[in-house]
Design a protein with these regions (language model features):
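Cytosolic, long alpha-helical scaffolding segments
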Residues: 1-261
């Protein structure tokens, strides 16, 4: 028995160490990416050639939009997994990341607005709409994820009844579709290769339509069935925020294409 106890204790320690290493690696990667973006901005500020300044700004916006979609993928996954599996650790991670991203994104946006003032006037006029469309929708995503998170935290933290399995079975394919869209959009933006972007935008619109159908079906269920109203409304609001997230992500992709090309 003592040997078994020691074995399980060792396994527990190894799991804790593995989680610490994974978390530290994630933080190191985030810091390295932010340092790279900051270095790029310093180069942009020192540059006096307008054409070169435009290329530096283009790289900066490409990186920050890539970062926001990576943040969106990770945070959406943590929120939905935390809700479906009643895992407060995932939800706390999402909460921390959202607060962190709010500060990071404000700094990025402020720097890029300065960059827009340094490029050629005609280029700035041409790209201004697409720049602000991307920025505004990135901000919408951050605050939309916060709205999605808050009722999930309240639900799981208070040990309310879990999501019914039929909700989970219905929602998992939606989560997978959203994740795939964000992954491909992130790759397009980071590489500047927008081949197939029109098809991806159509796919994104189809995902939005499927979520809308599920939302309407859920509204009908709430009116028709004698179910747990709190859980039913939580699921409905999660679907609503997911649909809004998809809409904003599509706008970012479309804006990035027009800004970069």
């Amino acid at each position: 028995i003592n040997h078994l106890g020691g074995f399980f204790a060792m396994i527990l320690v190894m799991c804790v160490v593995a989680l610490v290493v994974i978390n530290n690696n994630r933080k190191f990667k985030q810091k390295r990416e932010q340092d790279n973006v900051d270095t790029l901005f310093r180069q942009l500020v020192r540059c006096h050639d307008k054409a070169e300044t435009w290329q530096l700004l283009l790289q900066h916006v490409r990186r920050t939009q890539t970062d926001i979609l990576e943040f969106t993928r990770n945070t959406f996954r943590n929120i939905t997994q935390g809700l479906m599996h009643e895992n407060m650790k995932f939800l706390r991670t999402a909460s921390h990341d959202i607060e962190n991203e709010k500060g990071i994104w404000k700094r990025y946006r402020r720097k890029e607005i300065l960059g827009m003032r340094k490029i050629d006037y005609l280029v700035a006029v041409e790209k201004n709409t697409w720049f602000h469309l991307g920025c505004n929708n990135a901000t919408q995503i951050i605050y939309g994820l916060k709205r999605m998170l808050e009722p999930c935290v309240e639900h799981v933290d208070n040990n309310f009844s879990p999501l019914p399995q039929d909700y989970v079975d219905e929602f998992i394919p939606v989560c997978n579709d959203v994740d795939h869209f964000l992954e491909v959009a992130q790759r397009m933006i980071s590489t500047g290769n927008f081949e197939g972007v029109d098809e991806l935008l159509v796919e994104g619109n189809a995902i939005k339509s499927r979520i809308s159908q599920i939302r309407h079906a859920q509204q009908d269920r709430i009116q028709r069935e004698d179910s747990n109203i709190k859980i039913a409304l939580l699921y409905l609001s999660t679907l609503q925020e997911t649909q809004e997230l998809m809409s904003a992500a599509r706008h970012i992709l479309r804006a990035s294409k027009r800004f970069q090309t």
